[in-house]
Amino acid sequence: MSSPDGGYASDDQFHGNCSVPIMMGQYEWTDPLTMFQDAKTKKEAGSANSRGKAEARIRRPMNAFMVWAKDERKRLAQQNPDLHNAELSKMLGKSWKSLTLASKRPFVKEAERLRVQHIQDYPDYKYRPRRKKQVKREEEGFLPSADIPGPQVMGCNAMVGQNYKMQYSGQNSQQSQITPAGYFEDHNPVGFYYRGYNVPKYYMSQNSSGYCSPPTQGEYQALSYNFNSSYIPYQQNASAPAMGKQMAVKENIIQESPEHGIMGCQVSPQMYNGQMYVPECAKTHPVAQTEQHSSLHQSQQMVTQNYLPSQQDGHLESDIDKTEFDQYLMYEPKSDTELIYTIDQDSGAYSTNLLPSLISEANSVCYYDYCGV
Protein backbone atom coordinates (compact mmCIF):
# COMPACT_ATOMS: atom_id res chain seq x y z
CA MET A 1 0.00 0.00 0.00
CA SER A 2 1.43 3.20 -1.13
CA SER A 3 1.87 6.11 1.24
CA PRO A 4 0.13 9.42 0.53
CA ASP A 5 3.35 11.27 0.16
CA GLY A 6 4.52 8.90 -2.53
CA GLY A 7 7.35 7.50 -0.42
CA TYR A 8 9.24 10.84 -0.12
CA ALA A 9 8.88 10.93 3.67
CA SER A 10 10.31 7.49 4.07
CA ASP A 11 13.21 8.44 1.87
CA ASP A 12 13.86 11.56 3.97
CA GLN A 13 13.80 9.53 7.14
CA PHE A 14 16.10 6.96 5.63
CA HIS A 15 18.52 9.63 4.52
CA GLY A 16 18.09 11.76 7.62
CA ASN A 17 21.61 11.05 8.83
CA CYS A 18 23.16 11.93 5.47
CA SER A 19 26.45 13.77 5.62
CA VAL A 20 25.51 16.35 2.99
CA PRO A 21 23.39 18.60 5.26
CA ILE A 22 26.03 18.41 7.97
CA MET A 23 28.81 19.49 5.56
CA MET A 24 26.73 22.30 4.09
CA GLY A 25 25.95 23.62 7.57
CA GLN A 26 29.62 24.16 8.37
CA TYR A 27 29.99 27.06 5.84
CA GLU A 28 28.66 30.59 6.31
CA TRP A 29 26.45 31.60 3.43
CA THR A 30 26.31 35.29 2.47
CA ASP A 31 23.43 36.84 0.68
CA PRO A 32 24.33 38.42 -2.72
CA LEU A 33 22.15 41.40 -1.87
CA THR A 34 24.20 42.17 1.21
CA MET A 35 27.40 42.06 -0.86
CA PHE A 36 25.93 44.54 -3.34
CA GLN A 37 24.81 46.84 -0.54
CA ASP A 38 28.27 46.81 1.05
CA ALA A 39 29.90 47.75 -2.25
CA LYS A 40 27.38 50.55 -2.71
CA THR A 41 28.06 51.99 0.73
CA LYS A 42 31.82 51.92 0.10
CA LYS A 43 31.32 53.74 -3.20
CA GLU A 44 29.16 56.38 -1.55
CA ALA A 45 31.75 56.85 1.17
CA GLY A 46 34.49 57.36 -1.45
CA SER A 47 32.39 59.87 -3.37
CA ALA A 48 31.65 61.72 -0.14
CA ASN A 49 35.35 61.95 0.63
CA SER A 50 36.14 63.27 -2.84
CA ARG A 51 33.31 65.76 -2.56
CA GLY A 52 34.66 66.87 0.79
CA LYS A 53 38.09 67.42 -0.75
CA ALA A 54 36.54 69.40 -3.58
CA GLU A 55 34.55 71.51 -1.17
CA ALA A 56 37.63 72.10 0.92
CA ARG A 57 39.28 73.96 -1.97
CA ILE A 58 38.43 77.63 -1.76
CA ARG A 59 37.50 79.22 -5.05
CA ARG A 60 38.76 82.61 -6.13
CA PRO A 61 36.34 85.54 -6.10
CA MET A 62 34.87 86.33 -9.50
CA ASN A 63 36.04 89.35 -11.42
CA ALA A 64 33.82 91.68 -13.46
CA PHE A 65 34.02 89.59 -16.61
CA MET A 66 33.10 86.39 -14.76
CA VAL A 67 30.14 88.12 -13.13
CA TRP A 68 28.92 89.34 -16.51
CA ALA A 69 29.62 86.06 -18.36
CA LYS A 70 27.84 83.94 -15.75
CA ASP A 71 24.41 84.88 -17.10
CA GLU A 72 25.51 85.79 -20.61
CA ARG A 73 26.94 82.30 -21.22
CA LYS A 74 23.65 80.68 -20.36
CA ARG A 75 21.83 82.98 -22.75
CA LEU A 76 24.24 82.25 -25.63
CA ALA A 77 24.08 78.52 -24.93
CA GLN A 78 20.32 78.59 -25.22
CA GLN A 79 20.48 80.55 -28.46
CA ASN A 80 23.23 78.39 -29.98
CA PRO A 81 22.94 74.86 -28.58
CA ASP A 82 25.25 73.41 -31.24
CA LEU A 83 28.22 75.66 -30.46
CA HIS A 84 31.14 74.30 -28.49
CA ASN A 85 32.08 75.83 -25.17
CA ALA A 86 35.34 77.18 -26.66
CA GLU A 87 33.40 79.02 -29.36
CA LEU A 88 31.09 80.45 -26.73
CA SER A 89 34.08 81.72 -24.77
CA LYS A 90 35.44 83.47 -27.88
CA MET A 91 32.10 85.13 -28.49
CA LEU A 92 31.87 86.23 -24.86
CA GLY A 93 35.32 87.77 -24.98
CA LYS A 94 34.57 89.75 -28.12
CA SER A 95 31.26 91.00 -26.77
CA TRP A 96 32.85 91.99 -23.43
CA LYS A 97 35.51 94.03 -25.19
CA SER A 98 32.85 95.77 -27.23
CA LEU A 99 31.02 96.98 -24.09
CA THR A 100 31.50 100.54 -22.92
CA LEU A 101 32.84 101.53 -19.50
CA ALA A 102 29.39 102.69 -18.41
CA SER A 103 27.88 99.29 -19.18
CA LYS A 104 30.76 97.52 -17.40
CA ARG A 105 30.53 99.63 -14.22
CA PRO A 106 27.76 97.61 -12.45
CA PHE A 107 29.66 94.36 -12.97
CA VAL A 108 32.86 95.95 -11.66
CA LYS A 109 31.03 97.04 -8.50
CA GLU A 110 29.61 93.57 -8.01
CA ALA A 111 33.06 92.01 -8.43
CA GLU A 112 34.47 94.42 -5.80
CA ARG A 113 31.73 93.48 -3.35
CA LEU A 114 32.45 89.79 -3.87
CA ARG A 115 36.15 90.37 -3.29
CA VAL A 116 35.54 92.13 0.03
CA GLN A 117 33.15 89.41 1.11
CA HIS A 118 35.70 86.74 0.18
CA ILE A 119 38.36 88.45 2.32
CA GLN A 120 36.00 88.51 5.29
CA ASP A 121 35.03 84.87 4.87
CA TYR A 122 38.55 83.58 4.28
CA PRO A 123 41.09 85.91 5.88
CA ASP A 124 43.92 83.38 5.54
CA TYR A 125 43.23 82.66 1.91
CA LYS A 126 46.18 82.63 -0.44
CA TYR A 127 45.89 81.98 -4.12
CA ARG A 128 47.75 78.79 -5.03
CA PRO A 129 47.37 77.96 -8.71
CA ARG A 130 47.43 74.31 -9.67
CA ARG A 131 50.59 73.82 -11.62
CA LYS A 132 50.64 71.51 -14.56
CA LYS A 133 52.82 68.46 -14.22
CA GLN A 134 55.86 69.01 -16.38
CA VAL A 135 57.55 65.93 -17.71
CA LYS A 136 61.25 66.08 -16.93
CA ARG A 137 63.05 65.83 -20.20
CA GLU A 138 66.42 64.17 -20.06
CA GLU A 139 69.21 66.31 -21.35
CA GLU A 140 70.25 65.06 -24.72
CA GLY A 141 74.04 64.62 -24.40
CA PHE A 142 76.52 63.76 -27.15
CA LEU A 143 76.40 59.99 -27.31
CA PRO A 144 78.57 58.06 -29.70
CA SER A 145 76.45 56.61 -32.48
CA ALA A 146 76.67 53.03 -33.58
CA ASP A 147 78.06 54.02 -36.98
CA ILE A 148 81.06 55.85 -35.54
CA PRO A 149 83.55 53.43 -34.05
CA GLY A 150 84.93 54.23 -30.64
CA PRO A 151 88.55 54.49 -29.60
CA GLN A 152 88.66 50.75 -28.90
CA VAL A 153 87.75 49.95 -32.51
CA MET A 154 89.93 52.59 -34.13
CA GLY A 155 93.01 51.52 -32.26
CA CYS A 156 95.45 53.15 -34.65
CA ASN A 157 94.00 56.62 -34.70
CA ALA A 158 93.47 56.52 -30.96
CA MET A 159 97.10 55.65 -30.28
CA VAL A 160 98.76 57.67 -33.03
CA GLY A 161 99.09 60.76 -30.85
CA GLN A 162 100.62 58.78 -28.01
CA ASN A 163 103.06 57.02 -30.34
CA TYR A 164 104.12 60.33 -31.83
CA LYS A 165 104.76 61.73 -28.38
CA MET A 166 106.62 58.68 -27.07
CA GLN A 167 108.89 58.36 -30.08
CA TYR A 168 109.89 62.00 -30.35
CA SER A 169 109.71 63.23 -26.75
CA GLY A 170 113.43 62.64 -26.19
CA GLN A 171 114.44 65.04 -28.97
CA ASN A 172 112.17 67.92 -28.08
CA SER A 173 111.56 68.71 -24.42
CA GLN A 174 109.34 71.71 -25.17
CA GLN A 175 106.65 69.82 -27.05
CA SER A 176 103.02 70.06 -26.15
CA GLN A 177 101.31 67.44 -24.05
CA ILE A 178 99.85 64.24 -25.40
CA THR A 179 96.75 64.88 -27.45
CA PRO A 180 93.50 63.25 -26.35
CA ALA A 181 92.60 59.84 -27.68
CA GLY A 182 89.74 61.04 -29.90
CA TYR A 183 91.63 63.99 -31.38
CA PHE A 184 92.78 62.22 -34.53
CA GLU A 185 89.38 60.55 -34.97
CA ASP A 186 87.78 63.97 -35.30
CA HIS A 187 90.52 65.52 -37.45
CA ASN A 188 91.51 62.60 -39.68
CA PRO A 189 89.49 62.82 -42.91
CA VAL A 190 90.81 59.50 -44.21
CA GLY A 191 89.54 57.42 -41.30
CA PHE A 192 85.96 58.52 -41.95
CA TYR A 193 85.96 57.03 -45.45
CA TYR A 194 87.71 53.84 -44.34
CA ARG A 195 85.20 52.91 -41.69
CA GLY A 196 82.77 51.26 -44.14
CA TYR A 197 85.35 49.04 -45.83
CA ASN A 198 87.17 45.91 -44.76
CA VAL A 199 90.64 47.16 -45.57
CA PRO A 200 93.39 44.51 -45.29
CA LYS A 201 96.00 45.21 -42.65
CA TYR A 202 99.01 45.43 -44.92
CA TYR A 203 100.72 48.31 -43.17
CA MET A 204 101.36 47.80 -39.48
CA SER A 205 103.09 50.28 -37.23
CA GLN A 206 106.05 49.11 -35.18
CA ASN A 207 104.73 50.57 -31.93
CA SER A 208 100.99 49.99 -32.36
CA SER A 209 98.94 46.87 -32.88
CA GLY A 210 96.06 48.48 -34.81
CA TYR A 211 95.70 49.27 -38.49
CA CYS A 212 97.12 52.61 -39.59
CA SER A 213 95.60 54.38 -42.56
CA PRO A 214 98.11 55.77 -45.08
CA PRO A 215 98.59 59.54 -45.09
CA THR A 216 97.06 61.73 -47.72
CA GLN A 217 98.91 64.00 -50.10
CA GLY A 218 98.37 66.97 -47.81
CA GLU A 219 99.91 65.08 -44.93
CA TYR A 220 102.96 64.27 -47.05
CA GLN A 221 103.34 67.96 -47.84
CA ALA A 222 103.00 68.84 -44.17
CA LEU A 223 105.92 66.55 -43.40
CA SER A 224 108.15 68.54 -45.84
CA TYR A 225 109.60 65.16 -46.85
CA ASN A 226 111.65 64.88 -43.67
CA PHE A 227 112.39 61.25 -42.90
CA ASN A 228 114.17 59.28 -40.23
CA SER A 229 117.59 60.62 -39.41
CA SER A 230 118.74 57.15 -38.39
CA TYR A 231 119.23 56.24 -42.05
CA ILE A 232 121.77 59.03 -42.62
CA PRO A 233 124.76 57.38 -40.84
CA TYR A 234 124.19 54.20 -42.81
CA GLN A 235 124.15 56.06 -46.09
CA GLN A 236 127.19 58.10 -45.17
CA ASN A 237 129.15 55.00 -44.21
CA ALA A 238 128.09 53.11 -47.31
CA SER A 239 128.95 55.85 -49.80
CA ALA A 240 131.39 58.10 -47.93
CA PRO A 241 133.75 58.81 -50.87
CA ALA A 242 130.91 59.80 -53.20
CA MET A 243 129.19 61.89 -50.59
CA GLY A 244 132.29 63.99 -49.93
CA LYS A 245 132.16 65.65 -53.33
CA GLN A 246 128.41 66.12 -53.24
CA MET A 247 128.36 67.73 -49.79
CA ALA A 248 130.84 70.39 -50.88
CA VAL A 249 128.64 71.30 -53.84
CA LYS A 250 125.54 71.26 -51.62
CA GLU A 251 127.09 73.62 -49.10
CA ASN A 252 127.99 76.05 -51.86
CA ILE A 253 124.48 75.88 -53.26
CA ILE A 254 122.89 76.51 -49.87
CA GLN A 255 125.19 79.44 -49.15
CA GLU A 256 124.56 81.00 -52.52
CA SER A 257 120.78 80.60 -52.42
CA PRO A 258 119.65 80.15 -48.81
CA GLU A 259 116.04 80.99 -49.54
CA HIS A 260 115.56 78.66 -52.50
CA GLY A 261 113.51 75.51 -51.83
CA ILE A 262 110.81 73.24 -53.09
CA MET A 263 107.19 74.34 -53.14
CA GLY A 264 108.12 77.89 -52.11
CA CYS A 265 109.63 76.79 -48.77
CA GLN A 266 112.96 78.10 -47.46
CA VAL A 267 115.75 75.55 -47.42
CA SER A 268 117.98 76.83 -44.64
CA PRO A 269 115.35 77.78 -42.04
CA GLN A 270 112.96 74.84 -41.73
CA MET A 271 110.52 74.15 -38.92
CA TYR A 272 110.29 70.59 -37.61
CA ASN A 273 107.86 70.16 -34.71
CA GLY A 274 108.44 73.69 -33.45
CA GLN A 275 112.27 73.52 -33.78
CA MET A 276 114.53 75.45 -36.11
CA TYR A 277 116.44 73.22 -38.48
CA VAL A 278 119.86 74.68 -39.30
CA PRO A 279 121.90 73.01 -42.06
CA GLU A 280 125.32 71.58 -41.43
CA CYS A 281 126.98 74.33 -43.44
CA ALA A 282 125.70 76.96 -41.00
CA LYS A 283 127.07 74.96 -38.08
CA THR A 284 130.54 74.48 -39.62
CA HIS A 285 131.00 78.18 -40.53
CA PRO A 286 130.76 80.46 -37.44
CA VAL A 287 130.98 83.58 -39.59
CA ALA A 288 127.92 82.58 -41.58
CA GLN A 289 125.88 82.11 -38.41
CA THR A 290 125.93 85.79 -37.52
CA GLU A 291 125.05 86.79 -41.07
CA GLN A 292 122.16 84.36 -41.31
CA HIS A 293 120.72 85.08 -37.86
CA SER A 294 118.56 87.95 -39.04
CA SER A 295 117.46 86.08 -42.16
CA LEU A 296 116.56 83.05 -40.06
CA HIS A 297 114.38 85.16 -37.78
CA GLN A 298 112.56 86.78 -40.72
CA SER A 299 112.10 83.50 -42.52
CA GLN A 300 110.81 81.88 -39.34
CA GLN A 301 108.10 84.52 -39.12
CA MET A 302 107.24 84.00 -42.79
CA VAL A 303 106.96 80.26 -42.31
CA THR A 304 104.81 80.76 -39.24
CA GLN A 305 102.46 83.13 -41.08
CA ASN A 306 102.26 81.10 -44.29
CA TYR A 307 102.23 77.53 -43.05
CA LEU A 308 100.98 77.85 -39.48
CA PRO A 309 97.80 79.92 -39.84
CA SER A 310 96.29 78.76 -36.58
CA GLN A 311 97.34 77.22 -33.32
CA GLN A 312 95.49 74.05 -34.18
CA ASP A 313 97.57 73.41 -37.29
CA GLY A 314 100.75 73.97 -35.32
CA HIS A 315 99.52 71.52 -32.75
CA LEU A 316 98.97 68.94 -35.47
CA GLU A 317 102.42 69.45 -36.91
CA SER A 318 104.00 69.15 -33.47
CA ASP A 319 102.44 65.70 -33.08
CA ILE A 320 103.66 64.32 -36.42
CA ASP A 321 106.48 61.82 -36.20
CA LYS A 322 109.10 62.14 -38.88
CA THR A 323 109.70 58.37 -38.92
CA GLU A 324 106.08 57.23 -39.13
CA PHE A 325 105.60 57.35 -42.88
CA ASP A 326 108.78 55.59 -44.02
CA GLN A 327 106.88 52.32 -44.18
CA TYR A 328 104.55 53.58 -46.93
CA LEU A 329 107.29 54.49 -49.41
CA MET A 330 108.68 52.00 -51.92
CA TYR A 331 112.11 53.56 -52.41
CA GLU A 332 115.27 53.98 -50.41
CA PRO A 333 114.87 56.86 -47.93
CA LYS A 334 117.25 59.76 -48.24
CA SER A 335 118.20 62.70 -46.13
CA ASP A 336 116.64 66.17 -46.39
CA THR A 337 119.43 67.65 -48.48
CA GLU A 338 119.39 64.73 -50.89
CA LEU A 339 115.65 65.01 -51.33
CA ILE A 340 115.83 68.72 -51.98
CA TYR A 341 118.70 68.66 -54.44
CA THR A 342 119.67 65.96 -56.93
CA ILE A 343 123.21 66.63 -58.13
CA ASP A 344 124.19 65.98 -61.69
CA GLN A 345 127.72 64.57 -61.71
CA ASP A 346 128.55 65.84 -65.20
CA SER A 347 127.26 69.39 -65.20
CA GLY A 348 127.21 70.06 -61.46
CA ALA A 349 123.66 71.45 -61.71
CA TYR A 350 120.89 70.50 -59.32
CA SER A 351 117.28 69.64 -60.00
CA THR A 352 114.16 68.54 -58.18
CA ASN A 353 113.09 65.67 -60.45
CA LEU A 354 112.52 63.43 -57.44
CA LEU A 355 109.51 65.43 -56.23
CA PRO A 356 106.98 64.35 -58.93
CA SER A 357 107.92 60.70 -58.46
CA LEU A 358 107.45 60.99 -54.71
CA ILE A 359 104.02 62.55 -55.08
CA SER A 360 102.85 59.99 -57.65
CA GLU A 361 104.12 57.11 -55.55
CA ALA A 362 102.41 58.46 -52.42
CA ASN A 363 99.14 58.84 -54.33
CA SER A 364 99.38 55.29 -55.65
CA VAL A 365 99.95 53.94 -52.14
CA CYS A 366 96.90 55.78 -50.83
CA TYR A 367 94.77 54.68 -53.81
CA TYR A 368 95.62 50.97 -53.62
CA ASP A 369 95.25 50.89 -49.87
CA TYR A 370 91.88 52.64 -50.09
CA CYS A 371 90.59 50.21 -52.73
CA GLY A 372 91.86 47.24 -50.76
CA VAL A 373 93.95 45.89 -53.65
UniProtKB/Swiss-Prot annotation:
Domain Sox C-terminal: 256-373
GO biological process: gastrulation; Wnt signaling pathway
Subcellular location: Nucleus
The keyword NAD appears for this protein: no
Subunit architecture: Interacts (via C-terminus) with ctnnb1/beta-catenin (via Armadillo repeats); this interaction is required for inhibition of wnt-signaling.
Record comment regarding domains: The 9aaTAD motif is a transactivation domain present in a large number of yeast and animal transcription factors.
Protein name (Swiss-Prot/TrEMBL): Transcription factor Sox-17-beta.2
Organism the protein comes from: Xenopus tropicalis (Western clawed frog)
Designated gene of the protein: sox17b.2
